[in-house]
């Protein structure tokens, strides 16, 4: 299991939100490229970049994403946020991202099938859960699907690289990830899963590492790295124990 530092972009800055709320923002850097480079220099194998402007319907920051990708090369970068059509997915891949993270449109079976055909193993499907349902449109609306139902539908139709599971109620809280739900999603879907949301300590990472054999490939860590609650080298050591 690997640790994937998160770099969330909003209005040109590096920020973290709490529970996905645009009005609960903490700015950690005015220079996202420098922040991404810092994580790469400290040993990150992969970065998770989220374009929050795109997620909330504002113009996407493709140029900034391209700068980050170039600055951290050869570290792999996955990019999400507002990728709701084929052109948007293609744009981030052309900007150098290794994977595009798709959320809202993943509920459309035809779209998932087309993604698998056009970009095999280059797409990660975000499974964002709130109150037992999949949230969409920047985590604002709830769908009728459960996370397991979405994962099984994706497995049937698309050649995706992984699922990114986030328990929204824990995101940005540092209160611990939903280990049980993450492991269950990995086991039942048969698709590699990246855990996200709530990591606040090395114990949280160790808890995920302990069940990594269920199919948990990595964990995205945001606020805990930025506040210093955990260091990246220590987090990587804790995660590797479950590899």
Identify the role of each PLM range:
Residues 59-66, 140-149, 175-184:
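Charged helix-capping and loop-helix junction motifs
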Residues 8, 39, 47, 92, ...:
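Conserved, mostly hydrophobic/aromatic
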Residues 2-6, 46, 74-78, 98-101, ...:
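Structural preference for beta-strand elements that scaffold enzyme active sites
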């Amino acid at each position: 299991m690997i640790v994937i530092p998160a770099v969330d972009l909003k209005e040109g800055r590096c920020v973290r939100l709490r529970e996905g709320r645009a009005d609960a923002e903490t700015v950690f850097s005015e220079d996202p490229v420098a922040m991404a480079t810092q994580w790469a220099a400290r040993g990150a194998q992969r970065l998770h970049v989220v374009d929050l402007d795109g997620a909330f319907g504002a113009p996407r920051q493709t140029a900034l994403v391209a700068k980050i990708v170039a600055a951290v090369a050869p570290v792999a970068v996955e990019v999400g946020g507002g990728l709701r059509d084929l052109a948007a997915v293609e744009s981030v891949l052309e900007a150098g991202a290794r994977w595009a993270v798709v959320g809202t449109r993943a509920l459309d079976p035809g779209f998932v099938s087309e993604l698998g055909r056009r970009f095999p193993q280059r797409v990660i499907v975000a499974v964002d859960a709130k109150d037992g349902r999949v949230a969409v449109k920047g985590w604002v609306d709830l769908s009728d699907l459960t996370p397991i139902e979405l994962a099984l539908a994706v497995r049937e139709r698309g050649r995706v690289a992984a699922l990114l599971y986030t328990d929204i109620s824990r995101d940005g809280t540092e209160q611990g990830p939903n280990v049980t739900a993450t492991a269950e999603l990995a086991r039942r879907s048969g698709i590699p899963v990246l855990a996200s949301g709530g990591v606040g300590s090395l114990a949280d990472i160790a808890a995920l590492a302990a069940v990594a054999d269920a199919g948990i490939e990595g964990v995205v860590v945001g606020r805990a790295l930025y506040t210093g609650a955990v260091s990246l080298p220590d987090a990587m050591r804790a995660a590797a124990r479950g590899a």
